[in-house]
Swiss-Prot record:
<dbReference type="Pfam" id="PF01979">
    <property type="entry name" value="Amidohydro_1"/>
</dbReference>
<feature type="active site" description="Proton donor">
    <location>
        <position position="320"/>
    </location>
</feature>
<comment type="pathway">
    <text>Nitrogen metabolism; urea degradation; CO(2) and NH(3) from urea (urease route): step 1/1.</text>
</comment>
<dbReference type="InterPro" id="IPR050112">
    <property type="entry name" value="Urease_alpha_subunit"/>
</dbReference>
<dbReference type="InterPro" id="IPR032466">
    <property type="entry name" value="Metal_Hydrolase"/>
</dbReference>
<dbReference type="InterPro" id="IPR017951">
    <property type="entry name" value="Urease_asu_c"/>
</dbReference>
<comment type="similarity">
    <text>Belongs to the metallo-dependent hydrolases superfamily. Urease alpha subunit family.</text>
</comment>
<dbReference type="InterPro" id="IPR029754">
    <property type="entry name" value="Urease_Ni-bd"/>
</dbReference>
<dbReference type="GO" id="GO:0009039">
    <property type="term" value="F:urease activity"/>
</dbReference>
<dbReference type="InterPro" id="IPR005848">
    <property type="entry name" value="Urease_asu"/>
</dbReference>
<feature type="binding site" description="via carbamate group">
    <location>
        <position position="217"/>
    </location>
    <ligand>
        <name>Ni(2+) 1</name>
    </ligand>
</feature>
<protein>
    <recommendedName>
        <fullName>Urease subunit alpha</fullName>
        <ecNumber>3.5.1.5</ecNumber>
    </recommendedName>
</protein>
<comment type="subunit">
    <text>Heterotrimer of UreA (gamma), UreB (beta) and UreC (alpha) subunits. Three heterotrimers associate to form the active enzyme. The apoenzyme interacts with an accessory complex composed of UreD, UreF and UreG, which is required for the assembly of the nickel containing metallocenter of UreC. The UreE protein may also play a direct role as a metallochaperone in nickel transfer to the urease apoprotein.</text>
</comment>
<feature type="binding site" description="via carbamate group">
    <location>
        <position position="217"/>
    </location>
    <ligand>
        <name>Ni(2+) 2</name>
    </ligand>
</feature>
<keyword id="KW-0533">Nickel</keyword>
<keyword id="KW-0378">Hydrolase</keyword>
<dbReference type="GO" id="GO:0043419">
    <property type="term" value="P:urea catabolic process"/>
</dbReference>
Length: 567
């Protein structure tokens, strides 16, 4: 057998076991753990390459081969960092393994035939599409912005640029829920709606769940009282949906202990659990220590930088309909912004105590920066804290798995959609993001939605080849016409699906139901299940984890920043 140098092999087929890859311009390095292709039998498309008739491509009919194969991909997911071919059929992941022609090649698990399209993933990283669970539906254009960043599923609420939606992620009542489901039917992303959970009697909540929401949002701007919390969780337990909480910053109806008592050990998703985005001041951060609390962050506090504090005050005044000329409004805003808890938040993410990241889109958060900021935190923590104790080699594999889980599998588990999305696993919707390593986390090379390319960078349309500048992200065929209805999912509650909501509203997209929302616990949060004892000093706001002071220095320079956005 002929030999090839490791560098030449990587140049031709991408990295293999033992090779290391740097993520963008961060200090994060991953090492390939396994290679599911077969050395000497790799498939590659192009002139003089393998995927040709009678060679890597067989004679089987469409029923017996995949629709799409991503060749020689470096998969980065919560379950591993693995080199493999990825086969897609009928919009779902068919197999992860070895592609080729089973008539002449060994170990083939992904048959290639005349019906198979190829995406060349040699030298590329492939991740699952991101999931953003904190969406204010202020404008529909957020969907394309999110898709360009690598987010393919959006969970939240709202009705457009109304005061209520500027502040809260609630789509209130059956009429608005129906209209928003119809509007979202044409968006190129998966969606799930949250209803308004702020009532103390259950019938107004039940009718929203029956209308189609997959969760209820309790927000202090509508009154996050213990009675409302208890009522929403009671209905959630009854109808198997999730509850998301933005708790009472002003401590008017109780303190964090009262909110935890009202929750009563039941599963709940706490938004921006550090507190700058809202929640009991100054100690809502302590909630993430509890086994039933699924804590997330929104991205304006991630990572902690020199500008974080100054930026927040103006954001908060605008989003929560506050008046800078009213002293009480200013005091309310200032009570939420604490250097000490923001500095601790990054460390809690690195420890795996905070489980999810999200945006808070146009409402104190940036919809296109969930993925980017998650990796900036990972970089900052690598630089400040060094290698994690869980690492087993000279790489950052465990840290990378911890951080990618925060915006993929963990939000999917939290909201009962992990059976459909959230990871690169057989049977799940083929929502896949292809990255060049140098642009990882910043600018995808291709975003695949339900098996079709939905958006990608594209050069001059009148050029003789697709690459000449100016290059812009443009919607592709998977995001157009009736095709998008086959490539996306609308998530509904089980009650709504059983009641025929999709048929009554003439929704054209595929429907999936949420399930398992009430049994998921902090222990189920992949690589992010730590439940330490957390205390906050009421005077200094210092945060201690198991008695140890935790903090971080504000960054003055970040990777994945200006140098990537000069063009």
């Amino acid at each position: 057998m002929s030999n090839i140098s490791r560098q030449a092999y990587a140049d031709m087929f991408g990295p293999t076991v033992g090779d290391k890859v740097r993520l963008a311009d961060t200090e994060l390095w991953i090492e390939v753990e396994d290679d599911l292709t077969t050395y000497g039998e790799e498939v590659k498309f192009g002139g003089g390459k393998v995927i040709r008739d009678g060679m890597g491509q067989g004679q089987m009919l469409a029923a017996d081969c995949v629709d799409l194969v991503l060749t020689n991909a470096l998969i980065v997911d919560h379950w591993g960092i693995v080199k493999a071919d990825i086969g897609v059929k009928d919009g779902r992941i068919f197999a992860i393994g070895k592609a080729g022609n089973p008539d002449i090649q060994p170990n083939v698990t992904i048959p290639i035939g005349a019906a198979t399209e190829v995406i060349a993933a040699e030298g590329k990283i492939v991740t699952a599409g991101g999931i953003d669970t904190h969406i204010h539906w202020i404008c529909p254009q957020q969907a394309e912005e999110a898709l360009v960043s690598g987010v393919t599923t959006m969970v939240g609420g709202g009705t457009g640029p109304a005061a209520g939606t500027h502040a809260t992620t609630c789509t209130p009542g059956p009429w608005y829920i129906s209209r928003m489901l119809q509007a979202a039917d044409s968006l190129p992303v998966n969606i799930g709606l949250l209803g308004k959970g702020n009532v103390s009697q259950p019938d107004a909540l039940r009718e929203q769940v029956a209308a189609g929401v997959i969760g209820l949002k309790i927000h202090e701007d509508w009154g996050a009282t213990p009675a409302a919390i208890d009522c929403a969780l009671t209905v959630a337990d009854e109808m198997d949906i999730q509850v998301a909480l933005h708790s009472d910053t002003l401590n008017e109806s109780g303190f964090v202990e009262d909110t935890l008592a009202a929750i009563g050990g039941r599963t709940i998703h706490t938004f921006h659990t550090e507190g700058a985005g809202g929640g009991h001041a100054p100690d809502i951060i302590t909630a993430c220590a509890h086994p039933n609390i699924l804590p997330s962050s929104t991205n304006p506090t991630l990572p902690y930088t020199l500008n974080t504090i100054d930026e927040h005050l103006d954001m908060l005044m605008v989003c929560h309909h506050l008046d800078p000329d009213i002293a009480e409004d200013v005091a309310f805003a200032e009570s939420r912004i604490r250097r000490e808890t923001i500095a601790a938040e990054d460390v809690l993410h690195d420890l795996g105590a905070f489980s999810l990241t999200s945006s808070d889109s146009q409402a104190m958060g940036r919809v296109g920066e969930v993925i980017l900021r998650t990796w900036q935190v990972a970089h900052r923590m690598k630089v400040q804290r060094g290698a994690l104790a869980e690492e087993t080699g000279d790489n950052d594999n465990f840290r990378v798995k911890r951080y990618i889980a925060k915006y993929t599998i963990n939000p999917a588990l939290t909201h009962g959609i992990a059976h459909e999305v959230g990871s690169i696993e057989v049977g799940k919707l083929a929502d896949l993001v292809v990255w060049s390593p140098a642009f990882f986390g910043v600018k995808p090379a291709t975003v695949i939605k339900g098996g079709m390319i939905a958006i990608a960078p594209m050069g001059d349309i009148n050029a003789s080849i697709p690459t000449p500048q100016p290059v812009h992200y443009r919607p592709m065929f998977g995001a157009l016409g009736s095709a998008r209805h086959h490539c996306r999912l609308t998530f509904l509650s089980q009650a709504a699906a059983a009641n025929g909501v999709a048929e009554r509203l003439n929704l054209r997209s595929a429907i999936a139901v949420v399930k398992g929302c009430r049994t998921v616990q902090k222990a189920d949060m992949v690589h992010n299940s730590l439940q330490p004892n957390i205390t906050v000093d009421a005077q200094t706001y210092e945060v201690r984890v198991d008695g140890e002071l935790i903090t971080s220095e504000p960054a003055d320079v970040l990777p994945m920043a200006q140098r990537y956005f000069l063009f």
